[in-house]
Amino acid sequence: LMLGGILFGWAKPVPVNFSALRRPKQDMLWVAVAGPASNLVMALGWALLYKMAWLNPDNYFAEPLLGMAGIGIKINIVLMVLNLLPLPPLDGGRVAVSMLPHRQAYQLSRIEPYGMFILIFLAITPVLGWILMPLVSLMYQLLSLLFGI
């Protein structure tokens, strides 16, 4: 949905029933890591598809697959790195809260109501790019080395 030239909308967090967790603080770590881990698995899958298309350039579908797989790799790497930022409500913020001592975890968790505003501010300034790009480039290089692409 476009509203006034600005994309309006955001990904919704996966609902988690905290009362169903046996050890909420520790188990929240695993819940939070699942999102970025799924992005990593998808990036690996796209990299494998990219390699297969690259090895068969005469195939009719090679060129479109290379384009789709390249974008799939980039999107999933960016989402993984973004979600690992230690800013609640992002997954990285939840990981940090679950690993910090109680007092520091409480202080960090108090940022959560403002986390999206902080993230939007970072996104409309060059700061988010300064933070993300070195990590995104590193992950992209690691995938390139792993798959020889």
Language-model features, listed with the residues they occupy:
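Hydrophobic transmembrane alpha-helices and their immediate loop junctions
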Residues: L1-I149
